[in-house]
Amino acid sequence: MGGWSSKPRKGMGTNLSVPNPLGFFPDHQLDPAFKANSENPDWDLNPHKDNWPDAHKVGVGAFGPGFTPPHGGLLGWSPQAQGILTSVPAAPPPASTNRQSGRQPTPLSPPLRDTHPQAVQWNSTTFHQTLQDPRVRALYLPAGGSSSGTVSPAQNTVSAISSILSTTGDPVPNMENIASGLLGPLLVLQAGFFSLTKILTIPQSLDSWWTSLNFLGGTPVCLGQNSQSQISSHSPTCCPPICPGYRWMCLRRFIIFLCILLLCLIFLLVLLDYQGMLPVCPLIPGSSTTSTGPCKTCTTPAQGTSMFPSCCCTKPTDGNCTCIPIPSSWAFAKYLWEWASVRFSWLSLLVPFVQWFVGLSPTVWLSVIWMMWFWGPSLYNILSPFMPLLPIFLCLWVYM
């Protein structure tokens, strides 16, 4: 490294034939393509060259951040190529030290009545009252050229709007009320379907119990499988249509359905009689007819809001009107008992026993029902020879 000389130097990095535009060494002689000629052979002594300490500056140049060639880069002499940045993006702010790491839960929103009380108070009534204000009507409902400042044309408009608001200004029905209103019918429908499926299994269960009476101690087997129709062994309650026992199974099911219907009607009749909805006139001794003439005027209505009469009037042969009060409950049952007591006088002897039996506790009733259910099949086998006598006794009871 000496002074400026017109002769090229010898040594490492001084060969002009080796292009090295980066200028890694201070004594480097550039190629003639980079203005290194006889007039200006030494580029290091050029007053227009970059200072060597600039190579150590940190910047963004042609070779990436942190390295800037002192004599320009391969991209030329532009400011960006030399590492000169006109605008440097601001560094992000440092993270807060007092903030907890991780995603924090979103806080609950305050209720609407606290954040927007005007939205809660603003309903159809408030809106209608606001429309009655002359200032509001002057803004939204102009008078149509009225010079007096009155808004008489707007009166009809306001009344029309108020009539519309009275019919359409109601709030939207709550979905919870709609859901609860639909839930009740759905539960009723589900309970009805469940009850129907159980009711349909009752005839089959009763049919199985009916057929089991003929096979005590054994498995019920259909007797029609040994006939001309060769079918597999099956229960008499599940006969296929080709089995000769199929018609008997249908007949048993039909009788069972009739018995169930009769029991339902009896239960309904007992329920209506217990509630006093069967105002049957009691049987008056010495008279078997009721009058529809003058005695009708002495019939008083029942107490309360009931529309049934509370007394029954008859007209005996002497012409005097006799009124007997109708029982408020069990009127039909008492009428049947009085009628049976008149036809069969010996039934009056059973009154003390019936009264004692009715006064028994529910535990005794459940015990009697369990005994009848347990001993029923055996009693049927014992009493089956006497079953033909039952119609005879029934006819004697009716026609005596």
Swiss-Prot record:
UniProt-listed GO biological process terms: caveolin-mediated endocytosis of virus by host cell; fusion of virus membrane with host endosome membrane; virion attachment to host cell
Q: Give the residues annotated as coiled coil.
A: none
* Segments for region (Disordered): 1-50, 84-116
- List the InterPro entries: HBV_HBSAG
Region entry Pre-S: which residue ranges?
Answer: 2-174
One GO cellular component term, please give it: virion membrane
> Is Acetylation set as a keyword in this record?
yes
Q: How is it modified after translation?
A: Isoform M is N-terminally acetylated by host at a ratio of 90%, and N-glycosylated by host at the pre-S2 region.
Instruction: Region Pre-S1: list its residue ranges.
Output: 2-119
Q: Where in the cell is it found?
A: Virion membrane
Q: Which Pfam families match?
A: vMSA
Virion surface-side stretches of the chain, per the record, are 2-181, 275-348, 399-400
Which residues does the annotated region (Pre-S2) include?
120-174
Transmembrane segment boundaries = 182-202, 254-274, 349-369, 376-398
List the stretches on the Intravirion face of the membrane.
2-253, 203-253, 370-375
Relate the assembly described in the record.
Li-HBsAg interacts with capsid protein and with HDV Large delta antigen. Isoform M associates with host chaperone CANX through its pre-S2 N glycan. This association may be essential for M proper secretion. Interacts (via its myristoylated pre-S1 region) with the host SLC10A1/NTCP; this interaction is essential for viral entry.
The UniProt function text for this chain reads: The large envelope protein exists in two topological conformations, one which is termed 'external' or Le-HBsAg and the other 'internal' or Li-HBsAg. In its external conformation the protein attaches the virus to cell receptors and thereby initiating infection. This interaction determines the species specificity and liver tropism. This attachment induces virion internalization predominantly through caveolin-mediated endocytosis. The large envelope protein also assures fusion between virion membrane and endosomal membrane. The middle envelope protein plays an important role in the budding of the virion. It is involved in the induction of budding in a nucleocapsid independent way. In this process the majority of envelope proteins bud to form subviral lipoprotein particles of 22 nm of diameter that do not contain a nucleocapsid.
Q: Which HAMAP family match?
A: HBV_HBSAG
Query: Record's family?
Result: Belongs to the orthohepadnavirus major surface antigen family.
Record-given protein name:
Large envelope protein
Q: Which organism is it from?
A: Hepatitis B virus genotype B1 (isolate Japan/Yamagata-2/1998) (HBV-B)
Q: What taxonomic ancestry is recorded?
A: Viruses, Riboviria, Pararnavirae, Artverviricota, Revtraviricetes
